[in-house]
Amino acid sequence: MNSVFKRLKNYQEVYYLGENSVFQKSKIKGKFHSQYTRYGQPNEVAGGGFAKRELLELLPSDTEEQTDITITHRYDRNLKKDAFHLVITKGTGVELTASNERGLKYGMEALEKAIYLSNQQVVVPELTIHHEPSFPIRGVIEGFYGIPWTHDSRLDCIHFLGKHQMNTYMYAPKDDELQRKLWREKYPAEKIEDFEELLVASQNALVDFYYMISPGNDIVYTKEDEVGVLQQKLKQMIEIGVSHFGLLLDDIDYYLKGEAKQKFGTPGLAHAYLIKQIYSYLKNELAHSQLVICPTEYDTCYDSVYLHELSDNLPPEVQIFWTGPETLAHEIPTSDIAKMSEIFHHPTIIWDNTPVNDFEDDKELLFLSPYYNRSYRLNQFGVVGIVANPMSQWELSKLTIGNMAQLMWNAPGFDLTTSWQETLADYAGSEYVESLEVFTSHNENKRMIQPLPLELKEALEMRDKDNLNQSLTELNQAVEKLKTLSNKTFQKEIAPWFKRMEQDYQLWQAILAEDHELVRKLGTELKGAKVRIGTNLPLTAALLWGLVD
């Protein structure tokens, strides 16, 4: 395949006949002229401004320097948000059309990917690229139970999202008490400063920042002042510039009692009332706002009185979360979303609980799988977005989320095998791809796929020590290689599982040596360990073979 098509394979439409403009230099200069908006300072241009790039240096339209190409940026209201149309013509002309800043940024990224160096000459292919991201909303919801992320992790997450063509960060940590349990209380000044910093980071990365609140456990639906307290809590966020909000009514007892039951009759009508109050408030306070809600019945694939009453009584613009047919969905097939689209009648956002590991004993594990078992056709049935709920280990969550980003960006072109290789290479570099692939294959997300493949199950049942030894030797070597990866955050988060692998390998060596006393000692210790490798081969073998009680 031609190298230009290889570099641009993640874009939906690429037309290239093999013609190029060749410049006898190792870097070219481009003049940027926008008919879309006027930029006061060069660094305000989306996509990195006029900062130095590898092969292309952008200069403002009023530059007096000699340039090699001219990039003309135009606005087209008919293009979808985040879409772009890029045309590179013979000679010096580049036309980039978009309908928002992100579209401009993504078009500039495509231009940079198209340009390449050959024999110390810059080659600019003559081509046309048209791309519309498969989902308007693409990102992360910090919505897990357990210790919330640090402020630095959130900043890093926002940076990661912007770098990987995602555009949404949702703040919804279940154990932020002021977001859920103590929702009536205002945030202190220092916390507001953190939100302001997150908002600035989001704006710089062209990421939409959502503030989510969860009052459903104890809000009194019949008291107007309760709604007022909730509105004033949201006003704290409005005052610092937040315009995207979520009202979460998940994981609550939604059966009505007393006055609430007398007034509303059913939880669907009570929830619709509250949502409409918040929706109206946001519309009055802001010229532009967005509201997404999480219903209490967020994980079904069938209709109900609750969903009927809720969906029929909400303003049409309100978006609804759905996790798929289960809270931790093993799969989200086309048939299920087709059914739910007939039930919701509202724009739907998939709250995908992957790679989150906060359920039951999942916290002992790492979930490091590709983005398995999701329909590529979700956007054909009213799904406007996908947000991933990550692990508390943000750094390690980047693997699955980086892979998800590729489907969100271009669902028809998503190839699970090649995209996973690209994800691993993007994260760690080509030197570590093989080792990462081995380690992640032993730490699959058990909520999406069986963590123990058939060949290893059979090896355990048949006491096939040779095959098991080969697999464990490869895993041990992969861990040793990954220990040299110069990413301090990666090493800190993964250290407990590397330590567990060392202990597992000691147990395996004792099994091979038929040192039964040592096997019992090590196996008994590992039974009570706080973390474990997903395949858990040595301890499983010791238990299955009767070597450890």
Which positions does each model-derived feature cover?
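A generic structural motif
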Residues: 61-75, 170-174, 321-324, 351-354, ...
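Short, well-ordered loop/turn elements at secondary-structure boundaries
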Residues: 90-91, 136, 165-166, 344-345, ...
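C-terminal functional modules
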Residues: 4-5, 82, 409-549
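Catalytic cores of large soluble enzymes that bind and process phosphate-bearing ligands
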Residues: 43, 47, 51, 99, ...
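Contiguous, structured surface segment used for ligand recognition
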Residues: 1-135
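Aromatic-lined carbohydrate-binding surfaces of glycoside hydrolases
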Residues: 141-321
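Catalytic-core regions of glycoside hydrolase
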Residues: 116-119, 143, 243, 255-414
